[in-house]
């Protein structure tokens, strides 16, 4: 049995995916596909089509602890309007620029310096107006917006911090 205590409370309206552990040989797409190994961020492939709740993903992680070491959440309409503001560098500058808004959001931190994810919910009447923004489109400022994809939110080196109520 594994220790799945690293999984935070995740709303049941969010769809999730177990994440392959770093170094795990990934399933082949077809017979002629070359071997590929996980970098620790690769979601369980069938999760893109299946609707896995946090309980489903936790059970998979518990049953195969050497294969899956993290949990991700899908963003966009399939997770009730969840959007992730993903900061890979320049966290201090970004928090200074948008600190007031970021302080209100749940925050996923990691041991990587200057990196965090901030989680927001888009109102239902605005979900058709949201799109992902890549690092390139963001002017290489160190952030991107995840919408319609997935983001890893909990592994042994990350944790989710909920904002304090003012």
Regions from the language model: what does each represent?
Residues 1-160:
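Conserved phosphate/metal-binding and DNA-contacting active-site motifs used
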Residues 161-166:
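A short, hydrophobic C-terminal helix/tail in secreted or cell-surface proteins
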